[in-house]
Amino acid sequence: MPAATWTASPSPPNWPVPMPRRPPMPRSVKRDRWIALGLLLLVMGVAYLVLVHPWFTQPMLAVQDDLQSLRERELRVRVQLQQAPQVSQRLQQARQTLQSRPGFLPESSAELASAGLVQRLERAVVDASPGNRSCAISNRSPLQPETKRFTRVAVQVRLRCGTPELASVLYSLENGTPRLFVDNLNVMAQRYQLSPNESGNGLDIAFELAGYLRPGSNAGPVNTGAAPAAGEASNAP
């Protein structure tokens, strides 16, 4: 009797088991999520503006600006220190040039400068007319100094001169050293007597004789009392 044979039945194929589908998310839930995300971002922004920015970010920015300004200042100081020898040399040269320039009066104060102007005037008149035969100072009085960029010192002058003598006096004053300036010149023709034994036609001249003090000089007030030249008051009208 033949032996019985057993054959296994074929196993069914392993097919993937389908997952159950989730139901679609309602639109209201999506909208709520976006609203919640927006509110979260808004809260974070407000918290940054209220808590972080004024207490941390803003002070750090201020410190950064201060550091930048300090770096720039340090750089300028270093450059100035490097240029200090050249600046000192140029300053010394400028001072020497200022001392040698004839444009400023040598006196250190307005009072002394006014006296120096009067002496210059008297020398110019004596050179133009020795013995005051044809030119004389009838009056000269210092004016108050004018302090602007440079201190102007002036003397109000009145002369009695002939025409050639006046030209000589003005030339001597304006072309000497230090340089002087003749301002507000007023010339009038007038018959006058230069000496008891002589008479003729001459000029009555009024002007301001001015000069400038060096920077840093004392520009204090001066005595402005009029003082006719000694020995010449008799020539005044």
UniProtKB/Swiss-Prot annotation:
Residues 1-21 are annotated as: Disordered. Residues 10-21 have a biased composition (Pro residues). It holds the Pfam family T2SSM_b. This is Protein XpsM. The lineage of its organism: Bacteria, Pseudomonadati, Pseudomonadota, Gammaproteobacteria, Lysobacterales.
